[in-house]
Regions:
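N-terminal capping segment at the start of a domain
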Residues: 41-59, 207-209
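Glycine/aspartate-rich loop-and-adjacent alpha/beta segment that forms the canonical ThDP
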Residues: 245-305
Length: 305
């Protein structure tokens, strides 16, 4: 048994999928959870997001962590052809967290899925921690790319998708960007290249929570009509409620069946989703819960649907 299989979380030391088959064919996720199971994982991830950020000595990005939670849970517990025992498998799907400031949510997801021990979450952003404030693949199992400087994830994802195509690999490359991040021109240069090479193994997900550090994205650097922009750059465009697991599952699985062009999902989310006093509040971009806020947030997240 590998060391990774001993970690706590939903993985539960099982190297096989719920269908009882080893991971050899296309579209084999380690869990293949249904929507209700994914929602429960998202709830548990959100609880850890609150405690992780509250204990951080260097702040955090609570709002961004919470807006992306349903997307991450859907990817890791249903969509990605990978699992915690396959982090060195050359045929695994690759997930890149381009919005690196939201890594707290990703760490909580990785812990829940068994990639890292849940005990590590208490060391988030502490000195010499294995969980730094932005993704570092040399420190954290399951992290595929060092990010944080916005606009870098998609260009690298395009390169990985092209390399996979040239080598005959069936792997898919997924990348999550923020909507504010799309003001970076490097994203659009990469998008042009993805369309030129017809990279239908590339899946971009935009966490469109409409807020960034300084306020409303629509006021700082308007993006809309975002669907028209992506289509003009040669992408097949999908949209859904990015905090609705049923919609995420349906849309992402439908996207996997399309061929001939790179894909983008515009996921309409609420920054801070799941905690009423954090939702849609720009000040929570770089705020963490303290004192009574922690218990109040956890109380709201005590029960699933």
């Amino acid at each position: 048994m590998s060391a990774l299989n001993k970690y706590s979380g939903a993985y539960q030391n099982n190297k096989y999928s719920p269908r009882g088959q080893p991971h050899r064919s296309r579209s084999m996720n380690a869990f293949r959870y249904d929507a209700q199971q994914i929602k429960e994982q998202a709830r548990l991830i959100r609880r850890n997001v609150i405690t992780l950020n509250a204990a951080s000595p260097a702040g955090g990005h609570t709002g961004a962590d919470l807006s992306e939670t349903d997307i991450l849970a859907t990817l890791y517990f249903r969509i990605l052809d990978t699992g915690p025992e396959r982090i060195e498998d050359p045929e695994r799907d690759i997930y890149i967290q381009s919005k690196g400031h939201g890594v707290g949510g990703l760490y909580c997801c990785l812990a829940q899925a068994g990639y890292i021990p849940e005990a590590w979450l208490a060391d988030y952003q502490h000195f010499n921690s294995r969980l730094p404030g932005h993704p570092v693949r040399q420190k954290t199992p399951g992290i595929e790319l060092n990010t944080g400087a916005l606009g870098h994830g998609l260009p690298v994802a395009v390169g990985l998708a092209l390399a996979a195509r040239m080598s005959g690999s069936n792997k898919r490359i997924y990348v999550l960007t923020g909507d504010g991040e799309l003001a970076e021109g490097s994203n659009w240069e990469a998008a042009m290249a993805a369309a030129k090479y017809g990279l239908d193994n590339l899946f971009v997900i935009v966490d469109k929570n409409k807020l960034q550090l300084a306020g409303l994205t629509a006021e700082i650097m308007p993006l809309d009509p975002l669907d028209v922009k992506w289509a003009a750059f040669g992408f097949a465009v999908s949209e859904c409620d990015g905090n609705d697991v049923e919609q995420l599952v349906s849309t992402l699985e439908q996207m996997q069946t399309r061929k001939g062009a790179p894909q983008v999902l515009i996921a309409h989310t609420i920054k801070g989703k799941g905690v009423s006093f954090i939702e849609a509040r720009p000040e929570w971009h770089h705020r963490v819960p303290k004192g009574d806020e922690v218990s109040a947030a956890l109380e709201e997240l005590n029960h699933g649907e």
